[in-house]
Amino acid sequence: MAPTQSQSKATTQWSLTRLAQQVRPHPTLLLLIRSNPMGPHSAWSWLLPLVQSNPMSLRQYATALQSFVLLLGTTGCPRELFLDLYRFIPTLTRTLLTSLGCGPGGAVVLRSGYRSLVLACSLGASLLLSYHQGLIPRPSGTQACCLTLSLMLASLSQFLS
């Protein structure tokens, strides 16, 4: 019996909430982002080499993204950071986009394009959960959440096209 839409939604929300509870931002990662010599507006591109050379687990993605979210909460201009991300993610998606491949024995292999989409969706989930938990100030959080939802839709449409 296939799960209903409400069951699927509840399961997804439970999974994201559980992931958010397990993730503890690594202080060293946050320090590296803050002291990035390229400046805070390059914080997103700082993640690109990690994605390309060292595929991370979903939990590692979430830890990195949670740290980015906390960084957004400490700056006065989340809009600028999110607009920078808005420009960066489509490049990441185009660069890493690959189709589903066929592995040994005919198994479906999810390649790096899938990880790019997970990155964008994890960002959205991390941001929204952090906003809900009060980790991001309300005025900047509302605007950032709207930009992130737009970003997730843009990334999804690019991934599917």
Curated annotation (Swiss-Prot):
InterPro entries: Sapovirus_VP3 (IPR009949). It comes from the Viruses. Belongs to the sapovirus VP3 family. This is Uncharacterized protein VP3.
